[in-house]
Amino acid sequence: MITVEAFKKYFQRDFPFLPTEYEESEKFNYILDEDIEKAMGEMKALLPVSVFEDEVLEIAQMYLTAHCLVGDIRRSNQGLASNFTFPLQSRSVGSVSESYGIPQKFLSSPSYAYYTTTDYGLKYFALLYPRTRGHVQTVTGWTLP
């Protein structure tokens, strides 16, 4: 299982973590250890541990925790969260344009739509989805003649 310190190291460029020296009045401008611990608790409730190989499990835990953390922070900033839009579908700058869409079957699914609300959730979903389709396990054994 991941730790707060491991999470901070993995996402050191992604989040403004609380520095060791800070003014008390600026404390809530940063991500606190308590915020990460809360998100880790949510991750534990959502993560299907048995689906992931040992080498991938920690990465899945990191991205699902980050997804939960972003959702928690957005919800705590009520006004900001109320105007959230889904990930980019298309944009143009001059003569250059890009577009993509999240397939409707994911957006319509109560199980999957939640993961499409942040980039971290999409990254986690990219790890999860292929492991939940056509997943086969074999069991060795024999029968008596």
Task: List each language-model region with its residue ranges.
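Short loop/turn elements at secondary-structure junctions
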Residues: 70-145
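A sequence-level detector of short, solvent-exposed, charge-rich linear segments
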Residues: 55-62, 80, 84
